[in-house]
Amino acid sequence: MMRMIAEDYLHYVLDLWFERVVKPRLRGEACMVRYIDDFVLCFQFRSDALRAQEALAKRLSKFSLTLEPMKTKLVEFGRFAHRHASKRGRKRPETIYFLGFTMYCTRNQKGNFRIGMRTEKSRLRRALMRLQDQMRRMRHLSIREQMNLLNQMLRGHYAYYGIAGNIQALQRVHRAVEHYWRKMLSSRSWKGTVCWEQFQRIKEQFPLLRPKLYLPYRELQAIAIL
């Protein structure tokens, strides 16, 4: 209930205000992407972004709200960002951190601009630590029960982070789970360490889910166009 109230509150404070008050006064195009209290404002022109940043602070102060300084910054993002970054002496444009993803400027095989997305480093570390902690708690279970629980965790991770361009981060999680699982099986084996050949036979009988992209570039592009 409290979450619904907060959502309705921010819909009034932010969403309606941005659409009805801010956008009509801008020189170029703009949009907002928000999930609960995390949001990104996108502007065609830097001058609009600066004006909106000042107006946003005033708007929030009316409701005794403030922006988190560590999570708030103005970033140039888009097809001209690489060119402008090199002129300022930077190797690459700045990145955006949003909902557990690092968003960065990149190019496709044809050289056209594309938004790249990968798991944020801090989120990846936390995910690996959480997986390792949960695996310690299941070491007394049968191998089949362990496999079912591990696949349940992997399925949830892939479903959220399985987005185009993020396959390497998914593979890292998969390799880490395999490593922790073999280590866990070795710690409870009276014969000692489970060698890789033994572990391969275990995986053949009790396979772990392979990394999967639930949102490939083609579907991601269609959503962006909508």
Where do the PLM segments sit?
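Non-catalytic terminal/accessory segments
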Residues: 1-226
